[in-house]
């Protein structure tokens, strides 16, 4: 009932929309200027009238979120990509014209109710369900968000994989040193470390550290049930590999919404988050 919803919106300070894209767009239309809103759907993430809700994106993003009436919560996949790529473009380590390639792993909870229902009916020992690559038309719905908010002039190639575990995520970007305008892997680390050294939820792992690895393997579940994102730089003189690891349900979704809610209300950003 739209009239009932409208009455509820009028009484609220902030509404968080957790709806499919079309329903979120319709709800936002009903809300109008009745209250402030955070939209967790894809509907408004590249809309010019909405503020993008990734506080760590730039030095001024928090201030923009704090004063915004309409905030679009970022997508799970784009967050890691953006926090790895944007500083490198801003600092001139990467050109905005660089052709970027990104692979990602996610727990199946990222696919929503339909995927969760489908995959939980399939035994995890089914070899065909261990991992599933998708987005092979190279037009995943997050690609525009990844390009626009990174400052890139070109759409990245983005290939995600849904895995048999419920939650957890890694974003991976491979680069050649020849693409870095004379810079090396350590320069990439230094750039990311400088950008995020004072952030509560972004942790840049020391360059060359094996601490995140277990028997030389990286577990994509390593940040689960926290709002923390770990950024890692691996490489040699010729090649660099960037990784972001986080929980797709927390930092990748609900945790970011709580972060934005805290900022918009003028509260301590860390309240309700670990």
Feature annotation, model-predicted:
Residues 1-6, 98-99, 103, 108-242:
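C-terminal substrate-binding/catalytic lobe of Rossmann-fold NAD(P)-dependent oxidoreductases
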Residues 82-89, 143-147, 189, 193, ...:
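Predominant activation on well-ordered alpha-helical scaffold segments within soluble catalytic domains
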Residues 78-82, 182, 251-252:
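Loop/helix-junction capping segments adjacent to catalytic residues or to phosphate/diphosphate-binding pockets
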Residues 228-274:
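NAD(P)-dependent Rossmann-like dehydrogenase/reductase catalytic/cofactor-binding core
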Residues 87-91, 176-179, 260-267:
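Active-site catalytic microenvironments for nucleophilic, acid-base chemistry
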Residues 76, 179, 248:
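Residue-level signal for short, function-critical loop segments
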């Amino acid at each position: 009932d739209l009239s009932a919803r409208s009455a509820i919106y009028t009484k609220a300070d902030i509404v968080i929309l957790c709806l499919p894209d079309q329903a979120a767009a319709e709800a936002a239309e009903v809300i109008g200027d009745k209250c402030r809103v955070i939209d967790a759907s894809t509907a408004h993430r590249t809309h010019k009238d909405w503020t993008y809700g990734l506080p760590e994106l730039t030095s001024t993003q928090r201030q923009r979120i704090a004063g915004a009436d309409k905030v679009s919560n970022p997508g799970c996949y784009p967050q890691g990509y953006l926090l790895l790529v944007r500083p490198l473009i801003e600092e001139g380590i990467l050109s905005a014209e660089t052709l970027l390639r990104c692979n990602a792993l996610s727990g199946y909870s990222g696919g929503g109710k339909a995927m969760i229902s489908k995959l939980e009916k399939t035994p995890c020992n089914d070899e065909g369900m261990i991992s599933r690559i998708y987005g092979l038309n190279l037009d995943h719905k997050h690609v525009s968000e990844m390009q626009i908010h990174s400052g890139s002039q070109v759409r990245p190639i983005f290939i995600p994989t849904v895995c048999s575990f419920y939650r957890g995520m890694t974003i991976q970007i491979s680069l050649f040193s020849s693409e870095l305008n004379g810079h090396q892997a350590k320069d990439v680390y230094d750039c990311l470390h400088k950008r995020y050294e004072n952030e509560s939820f972004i942790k840049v792992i020391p360059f060359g550290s094996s601490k995140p690895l277990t028997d030389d393997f990286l577990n994509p579940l390593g940040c689960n049930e926290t709002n923390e994102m770990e950024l890692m730089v691996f490489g040699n003189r010729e090649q660099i590999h960037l990784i972001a690891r986080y929980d797709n349900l927390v930092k990748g979704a609900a945790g970011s919404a709580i972060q934005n809610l805290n900022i918009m209300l003028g509260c301590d950003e860390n309240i309700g988050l670990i």
